[in-house]
Amino acid sequence: LKTSLKPKHNMRFLFSCLFLVSFFSVFSQEEVKPKIEPVIKIDSLYREDQFYFSVTYNLLSDIPKGLRQDKFSAGLSLGFLRDMPINKKRTFAIAAGLGLSYQNFFQNLTISKDGNGALVYAVNDYNEIVSNKYRQYMVDLPIEFRWRNSTYESTKFWRIYAGLKLSYAFSTKSILDDGETTYKIVNNSDVNKFQYGPYISAGYNTWNVYMYYGLNPLFNNIKTASGSSLDVKTLNIGLIFYIL
């Protein structure tokens, strides 16, 4: 009799195990798994506006009588500025960097040569010349103080930047065509190689106005053929764009 009861107990045990396995399987399937959201890292130690590009209209100030500009005298510059915030909110900063710039001037200040090869500066009427222009390429060293109302969550903000720029003119060229002779003066030694002046830029998001004024004259102690001092300075007005 004892032997005949053993299979029944074994069968009951087997069915009990199957029931428990099925129960836990159904329970685990109905269990709601929490949704895993991706972790977004926020850089609270951000820096702003470290690359720049500008387009300007170039003017000459402190000009002698009769000097005028014609056409569009364009200027281009680009460079890098290291942004160094000085407060916890990073709304104030100092920036210093390195850049390159190109300036072109169409005007009636002519540079020619006399019979001995000496340079002659004169202010001529436009009906006396076919074309006349001066251009220079420079390495720029800007340093500026910055204010902006930026946050690490937005790339759109107001800004006002003001600073001082020191430039070295590593290449200059003037071309005069008076209808009879073309004079090309390359790397004129009378040009101030080192030029400096204050600048300011201000705007919102992409669009920012820019202005630079040269403090020292474009030429060193030069007089025109009529005896007028040539103390012209540069003035650049235009737009500047910042990225990163």
Give the ranges of each region predicted by the language model.
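Extracellular/periplasm-exposed beta-strand and loop segments of Gram-negative cell-envelope proteins
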Residues: 64-71, 106-136, 169-197
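Bacterial Sec-dependent N-terminal signal peptides
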Residues: 1-34, 239, 243
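Predominantly the C-terminal beta-signal and adjacent terminal strand-loop region
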Residues: 40, 46, 187-244
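Residues on the lipid-exposed face of transmembrane beta-strands in outer-membrane beta-barrel proteins
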Residues: 78-84, 98-100, 141-149, 162-166, ...
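Glycine- and aromatic-enriched membrane insertion/assembly motifs of diderm outer-membrane
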Residues: 50, 59-60, 68-126
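Residues that define the transmembrane beta-barrel architecture of outer-membrane proteins
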Residues: 47-49, 70-76, 92, 135-141, ...
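Short loop/turn motifs that connect adjacent beta-strands in outer-membrane beta-barrel proteins
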Residues: 37-49, 85-92, 150-158
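Short glycine/proline- and aromatic-enriched beta-strand/turn motifs that initiate or cap beta-hairpins
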Residues: 29-83, 242-244
